Each structure stands twice: as structure tokens, then as C-alpha cells.
Design a protein with these regions (language model features):
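Short amphipathic, positively biased membrane-proximal segments
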Residues: 1-142
Length: 142
């Protein structure tokens, strides 16, 4: 694995591991923030009513898959797990389209777009083929 692949995996995966661990340890504030979005999702997906449990489960996925990606273990699988986790996290955590205050709306839009960029990076890793891929990163060298 080349140095850029190692660094990229460590930065991308490590960020998820840290944020996920925080959600597992202290889910209350995130559960409150996610509550309205979870209610919307429950209209089409049968989720448990315990918002803190859902935040903890999502955090555990991010912690485990983030750590795996950070060390180059199953990078494509880890990236897919993180991508699947990031979509509801972004929808629930950064609904800038619902915010009236211009400054808060701009801040939440920035966070939404940051998550979209992270999702893009995860999709690059998940979609990279094995042939010609940088060892352990899933990212094509060409």
C-alpha cells in the first residue's frame, strides 16, 4: 500500500471511528437532533422507537467500519458500511433546508456538503476494482 493510500484511509476511517465512538458513549444530544428525521423514516421503515439505541447502533457501525478502513482492513466493505451509515446521519443531522436563520442554515449546509464529500470518498473506495488498485485502499492507481 502506498503512503497516500495509507494516509487517506487513516484520515477518512479515523474520522468516522472518532465520531462514531462519541455517538456510542453519549447518544442523547444526537438522538434529540435525529428524532424528527427518524419519525419521518419510521413512516416507511419499521425502526425501533428508541432513538438513543439507533444512534448507538449507527455509532457502533461507524466506529468499527471506520477503524477497519483506517487500518486498511476490508476497505471496500468498510466503505460501503460507512456510506450506508452516513446517508441517514447526514439527513437527520444537517437538514439545512428546514432552517430559517441564514447563518445557521449556511453552517448546516456546509456540514451537509462536508458529509457529501466524505460520502464521495467512500464511494470511490467502495467502487474501486481490485485489479490495479492500490494495495489495501481500494483506490485505483490510474
Amino acid at each position: 500500500m502506498n503512503i497516500l493510500g495509507r494516509l487517506g484511509g487513516a484520515l477518512l476511517g479515523g474520522s468516522f471511528a472518532v465520531f462514531g465512538y462519541g455517538a456510542v458513549r453519549d447518544p442523547a444530544a444526537l438522538a434529540k437532533l435525529a428524532g424528527p428525521a427518524l419519525e419521518e423514516i419510521r413512516k416507511v421503515v419499521p425502526l425501533p422507537k428508541d432513538d438513543e439505541l439507533l444512534v448507538r447502533v449507527n455509532g457502533a457501525v461507524q466506529t468499527g467500519a471506520g477503524a477497519a478502513l483506517a487500518i486498511g482492513l476490508f476497505p471496500r466493505t468498510s466503505a460501503l458500511a460507512l456510506a450506508g451509515s452516513l446517508i441517514p446521519t447526514t439527513y437527520a443531522g444537517h437538514p439545512f433546508w428546514t432552517i430559517e436563520d441564514p447563518a445557521q442554515r449556511k453552517a448546516q449546509r456546509t456540514q451537509f456538503l462536508k458529509n457529501a464529500a466524505m460520502l464521495g470518498g467512500l464511494l470511490v473506495v467502495a467502487g474501486a476494482g481490485r485489479k490495479g488498485a492500490a494495495s489495501g485502499t481500494g483506490i485505483s492507481a490510474g
